[in-house]
Amino acid sequence: MRIGVIGAGQLGGTLATWCAESGHDVAVTSRHPERLREQVDRMNGKLRVMSVPQAAAFGEVVIFAPNWSGAKEAVDVTRSALEGKVVIDVTNPADGAPVAAGPGGAATGSHLTGASIKDPILVAAAINGPPSEAADRMLSHAGGKSGLETLIEWAPGAHWVKAFNTIPTDVLSRRRGHDPLLAEFVCTDERDAREAACRIIRDLGFAPFYAGGAKAARLTETGGPLQSREVDVRDATDALAEALAALR
């Protein structure tokens, strides 16, 4: 698979290297390509450095990994290239950055403060179903929107999916490929995006776990109850249910 990686920070650069090690053809963007020379040389042609528009055009799947402050600019210069493609969003809105307010209440960053979501009857009813469906039902009543939903508004022609945004790179490196596999929460409303993200997650040595649609990404982003949680895949169902219950 050809994978374009937009952003060669700690996470983006690491994912680019792992994808190349897993046999994918990878193009990564960087403002300082000389810093990637060692990784490029080591990958024997599987990893190359391109401009942001070039990497977006190169990838059959694109990993979107800029800093949140540069996310809008990155979308603006790649929107046409992303049309119809699966884009894996690994960003987190900056803590305290306004995302949007909805009728249920205000939201700051990924913090969920809508009053209706704290209704214990709603919480109890929601967690009785499959956790991923429960997340979608509960969060449809809350105010605000996830960073993923914001990206969807900016580039609606892309097939967006959230993954790789809950755990820091050092933990990913420590847990990669080791049993019990680390769960990687996946949030999307697009079937092809879910399938592509799950394939890459497995290729990189983790276990995909579907947490719900784009609204459910709020659970995994900055301030959400799944952010910074190191969860084994065998415990992922319970962790998602606990995350929903924590919103009371």
What does each of the following model-derived ranges do?
Residues 102-105, 109-114, 125, 129-144, ...:
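Short beta-strand and adjoining strand-loop segment in the mid-core
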Residues 170-171, 179-248:
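Active-site-lining helix/loop region of Rossmann-like oxidoreductase modules
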Residues 89, 159-165, 209-211:
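General beta-strand structural signal in soluble alpha/beta enzymes
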Residues 1-45:
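NAD(P)+-binding Rossmann beta1-loop-alpha1 motif at the extreme N-terminus of oxidoreductases
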Residues 138, 142-166, 173:
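Short, glycine-/small-residue-rich phosphate/pyrophosphate-handling segment
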Residues 40-100, 124, 128-131, 154:
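Rossmann-like NAD(P)-binding element
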